[in-house]
C-alpha cells in the first residue's frame, strides 16, 4: 500500500526541538549548513518520503529547506511516480508537497475502489454504473490512472484479482477519454494531418492500455520523412521539398518535382525500410493500428495508404485518399491547375503494392470488376475512418464464440460514435449485451440503456418492430429473473452428493484428448448443461456419460470450457494459464497451483485444503523422485 509520508510533513514542529537547534553551535550542526547544501543532501536519493516528513518535523530551519523551493518534495515525487513527470512543464509553478499529498490520496482512493470490485461484481461483468465511483473521485484523472498502472506493474504472479479489475477500470477510463476526443475531432475541419490523427484515435481506442500517442507517431513518421529527404537530395539537391520545415503545409505544383518525391518515398519505404502489404496475414486487426504498422512495417491498403499520404504531403505532394472498393488507393493529379478534371486525369497509387502507379483500367484489373466514376472520388476524414472501423467491425464478427468480443464491442462503439443512427448496428449492440450478459448488479442502468437503444431503433425504422419487440421482451424477462435470484451457492466437498468429485478449484490440469492446459475455477457433481449441449458435444459417447463431475476450466487459448472429469488429468509441469479472466477467480499463482480469491473461496470453502494436499502428494512426490 502507498505510504503516508505526506501526513508526517504536516505535523506541528515541536517547540523543544527548535530551542535545541537554536542552541547548537559549530559547523557540525546540520541546520547551519547553507540551504543549497541541505537541499542537495535531502535530494540525494537515500531518504524516503517518510524520512523527509520526519526531518521537516524537527525544526523550522529544516522544514523551510524542505518546503521553500519545492525541490526536495519534487525529487520525492519524481522518485515515487517517475511516469507522471512528463505532464509537468519546467515553467509551471507547482507546490510539490501538496502535489505529493494529492497524488498519494488519489492512489489510496483508487486502491480502495479496486479492492471493492471483486465482491461487488464477481458474479457478472462490471456494469455501466460500476465505474461511477472512480469517475466521481476528486483530483487529477492522471493520478488515478497512474495508480492503476502501478497495480498492473506489481509482481507478476501476485495480486491477480487487483490487476484484473485495475485493468478493467483503466480500460474504461481511457476509452471514455479517447471517445470524447474523437467526437470533438470529428467536428473540426479536415486537413491533411487529420487523416493520421483520426487513425491514431482508432488505434488508441482499441488499445487503451498501450502507450500510444499522436506525438510519438508523428515523430516516427518525421524520421521517415528525413530519410526520404536524404534520398531526394541525391536525386535533386535543389528540390524545393528539402527546404520545407516541419509543420508547413506548402505544396509543390510541378509534376516532375512531385514525381521525384514519390520515387524517393518508394525507395525509402519499400527498399530501404522494407515496408510491405501483409498478404500472409491480411485479416489481422494489427494491420489497421498505425503504431503496429510502423513497428511491424506491414499493413493493409488503407493503413499503408495513410502512411504514404502523410509522408507525401509533408514533402509537398498533394495526394488524396480514394475509397476504392476492396482496395484503398491514393490519387495523384496530372491535370493543369484550375482545369476541369475527370478520373482519367489522375494516376492512382497502390501503397499496399509498393507504391505502384496505376491507370483507371489497371485499377479495375486490380479488383477484377468495372466500377463507376464516383468510386474514384476523394473522400473526407470521416469516410476514411468509417472504412477503417468497418474493417475492424468485420474482424470483430469473426471472433470465436469463446472470446470476449472486445474488438466487436470497441468497433461498434467507434462506428456508432460517428454514425449514431445505424439501425442494424444498434440492434447488433443490443444483442451483444444480451449475449455477453453484461448486466448491472443492483440497478438496471444497462437494461434501461438497452431499452433506450431499442426505442431509438423503433423511431428510426418502424419496420424493425418484430426484432425490437423480441429484445424488449427478453430485457423485461431478465429484470424479473434478477428479482428472483437467490444468494451465493456454496459447494462443500464433504457432502455425500459430491463424493465423486476428484479435483478442486485452482489445480492446473491437462485435457487428455485435446492436450490443452487449463485451471479449474468451478465444478458440478454431474453435467448441468442442457440436453442440446450434451447431444452436440457427444457426451453420451464418454464411458461415464453425463453422470460424472464436470469442471469449469479456463484454457490457455483464452476460452472457457466445461470438461468431463474422465478427460482431465494433473499437469505434471504446471504453468501459468494466460487467460484474461484468471484474475477474476484467483489471487495468486504459486508455481504449482492457483490460490482462489475471497469470493471464489466462499463458493468452494473446502477446496483449498484439498488443493494443498494434492499439491503435496503430486508435486512433492515428483521432486523426491527427481532427487
UniProtKB/Swiss-Prot annotation:
Highest taxon listed in the record's lineage: Eukaryota
Keyword Acetylation belongs to the record: no
Pfam families noted in UniProt: F-box-like, Transglut_core2, YccV-like
Keyword Mitochondrion carried by entry: no
Disulfide bonds: none
SMART domains tied to this protein: YccV-like
GO BP field: apoptotic process; cytokine-mediated signaling pathway; ERK1 and ERK2 cascade; hematopoietic stem cell differentiation; hematopoietic stem cell homeostasis
Residue stretches making up the F-box domain: 27-76
Listed GO MF terms: DNA binding
Keyword terms, alphabetized: Ubl conjugation pathway
NCBIfam families: yccV
Role description: Substrate-recognition component of the SCF (SKP1-CUL1-F-box protein)-type E3 ubiquitin ligase complex.
Subunit structure: Directly interacts with SKP1 and CUL1.
Protein name listed in UniProt: F-box only protein 21
Source species of the chain: Mus musculus (Mouse)
